[in-house]
A protein has these predicted regions:
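Charged, solvent-exposed interaction patches on well-folded alpha/beta domains
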Residues: 1-148
Length: 148
């Protein structure tokens, strides 16, 4: 009883978890000291107990999106087990329930064609359909102002 043992373990965050916590590489949640500088990291949200699943899906999506020069900025799994991802180009992707990796794989296969097919920046993609998906684009103003 005349000794005090203290163990200090450095935590390396890989993502934000919720509003105030971080997730480490082993999918463990920790809260930093208030004075810690907040790094630029992706933001994850999910139900308690799903940290490991969210981190695994994030890593898989990152690998899949790399050839498209995209990355995951945020990944959310809600209480109904519905997935949503926001990409580095500000594109929101509604993945829905089921296997998010399979649905993103379908998106990755046709992404270059979608880019080439339309005018206006893509704002969101809805992958919840079994036989396709919906793309919402930002409206392009085709009316030029005349000066005279």
């Amino acid at each position: 009883p005349d000794r005090l043992s203290i163990a200090v373990k450095e935590q390396q965050p890989v993502a934000y978890w919720g509003e105030k916590a971080f997730l480490n590489p082993r999918a463990r949640v920790f809260e930093p000291e208030p004075s810690v500088d907040l790094p630029a990291l992706p933001r994850f949200e999910g139900p308690d107990g799903y940290e490991q699943r969210v981190l695994l899906v994030y890593r898989q999506l990152q690998d899949m999106l790399k050839p498209l020069h995209l990355s995951v900025d945020s990944l959310r799994l809600d209480a109904r087990r519905t997935w949503r991802v926001r990409l580095s180009n500000d594109l929101t992707v509604e993945i829905g329930r089921g296997n998010p990796v399979d649905r993103i794989a379908r998106f990755v296969r046709v992404y270059p064609a979608i880019l080439a097919a339309g005018s206006g920046q893509m704002v969101s993609v809805d992958l919840r359909y079994s036989n396709g998906f919906a793309v919402r684009r930002q409206q392009v103003d085709t009316h030029a102002e005349s000066t005279g």
